[in-house]
Amino acid sequence: MKSKKQILRLRKRAEFLTVRNGEKRRGPLFLMEVRERTEEESNAAKTGDNPRVGFTVTKKNGNAVIRNRIRRRLKEAIRCHAGRDMAPSTDYVIVAREQALNAPFSQLTEELSRRITAKGERRSGRKRRTERPEPGPVNGK
């Protein structure tokens, strides 16, 4: 029987702050911050190559009951479905948005899987401006 990949939790503030320097993947239900650990960091934390995940639900989302409900939904979605897509030796922080509370569970799991596997993708059709625009007239003069 194939053993499940163990997903560990981020619990310390320093771990959350380290992940903030990584890649950010935005979605309608949450923001996902992703950072790959170096081998030295994995050895120091004694985590091996297991992925780690942390959850942030701010007071802007509601009172403690609502925040905990959002956190529980995200944890269950990771445990049941999206955890299998997580890369080894990678830390994930999920910053929940208010819409995560009322979204259908299937949509939540699909969005999590999409954000976990979307490595460095940019929206096509949008060009980044590389040069500053020419200065135009001030106040229509």
Swiss-Prot record:
Q: Which InterPro entries match?
A: Ribosomal_Su5_D2-typ_SF, Ribsml_uS5_D2-typ_fold_subgr, RNase_P, RNase_P_CS
Q: What keywords tag this UniProt record?
A: Endonuclease, Hydrolase, Nuclease, RNA-binding, tRNA processing
Which EC class, in a word? hydrolase
Task: Check the record and name the SUPFAM superfamilies matching this protein.
Answer: Ribosomal protein S5 domain 2-like
According to its UniProt record, the EC number is 3.1.26.5
User: Is the keyword Transmembrane helix in the record?
Assistant: no
- Write out the catalysed reaction: Endonucleolytic cleavage of RNA, removing 5'-extranucleotides from tRNA precursor
- Which ranges are annotated Basic and acidic residues under compositional bias? 114-123
Q: Which domain of life is it from?
A: Bacteria
The record's note on quaternary structure and interaction partners says: Consists of a catalytic RNA component (M1 or rnpB) and a protein subunit.
The name under which this protein is listed is Ribonuclease P protein component
Please tell me the species this chain comes from: Brucella suis biovar 1 (strain 1330)
Species classification: Bacteria, Pseudomonadati, Pseudomonadota, Alphaproteobacteria, Hyphomicrobiales
